[in-house]
Amino acid sequence: MNKSAALQMVVSMALFGSIGFFTRQTGVSAEALVFIRCICATLFLGGLWLLLGYAKREVWQRREVIRTLVCGVFLVLNWVFLFKAFEAMSISAAISIYNLAPIFVLIMGTLFLGERINIQSVLAVVVCFLGSLFVVGIEQFKSVDNFLNSGFIWAILSAFCYAMTMFIGKNIQQLSSYATTFLQTIVGIFMLAPIVSMAEFSGLSTTNWLYILGTGFIHTGFVYYLFFNSLRKLPALVTSALVFVDPLVAILLDVVILNFRPSWLQLLGIAFIFGGIIYTLLKPVPQAAVDNKSDLA
C-alpha cells in the first residue's frame, strides 16, 4: 500500500470531518456559504488544473460534459442541504444520516441498473433506516412541526443528492477529477448567485471570514486536491475504510468542542447506520451484478 497516499487520504478525510464545526462559526446562511465555497473551489482547483497541465490533456466528450453538469446541480444541492442540516440538528446526527448515501446508491443500482440485491443487503438498508430514526430522536416524530424542524429532511436530502452525484457520475471516465469539479463548482456559482444576498456578508467579524474562507479553500480546495491525488493510488477497499475518518472526526469534534451528548438511543442509531454502511461497502459484488451494469441514457 502507498503510505504517502494513505496519509493524504486520512488528512483529507479528517479535515473534511471538521466542516460541520466550521459551518457553525461562519455566521452566514447555507446558500451563502456554499456560494463562497464554489468560488474558492473554482479558483483553487481551476488554478491547479491549469498549473499541473491537466487542462491541456483533457478529452472532452459531449455526453460526459452534460453528465458532469447534471452532477454539479446535485453536488451543490447536497452541500446546501447538508449545511442546513448542520443548522437544525447536531453535527453527529447530520453527518450520520448524510453517510447513508451509499445505501441510496445501492437502491438506485437495484432499481435502474438491474443490480442484484440479496436479503443481507435489504437487511442493511432496513438497519440504516432504523438507525437514522434513532439518531434524530423518536420524540421528533410525535408531531409534524417537530419532524419538519428536526433537520431530518435536510440531512436525508443531502444524502440523496450526494448519492445522485455518485450514481450519475460513476460513468465519467475521460474527464479528470479537476475538470469535473471545476465544471460542477461553476454550475454552483450560476445556481446560487441569483438567490444569495450580498448583504449577508456585511458586518461579519474577522473570525467569521476566516471560517468562511477556510470552508472554501481548505475543505473544498486543499481537501479535494489531497483526495484526488491519493484516490488513484489506493485500492478501493482501503479507500472505503478510510472515508470513515470523516464522520469519526465530525462526531468527536461535536462531542469534545460543541458539547454534544448523545443519548443511548442516538448511539445505537449511529452504530446501526455505520454498521449497515460498512457491510454495504465491504460486501463482495456478484459478477452478475457487474455484468448487468449499463451506461445511463
Regions found by a protein language model. Give the residues of each.
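Transmembrane alpha-helices of multi-pass small-molecule transport proteins
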Residues: 28-77, 104, 160-165, 182-200, ...
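Hydrophobic transmembrane alpha-helices of multi-pass small-molecule transport proteins
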Residues: 45, 49, 108, 120-139, ...
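Cytoplasmic-side transmembrane-helix entry/capping segments in multi-pass membrane proteins
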Residues: 6, 62-69, 117-129, 152, ...
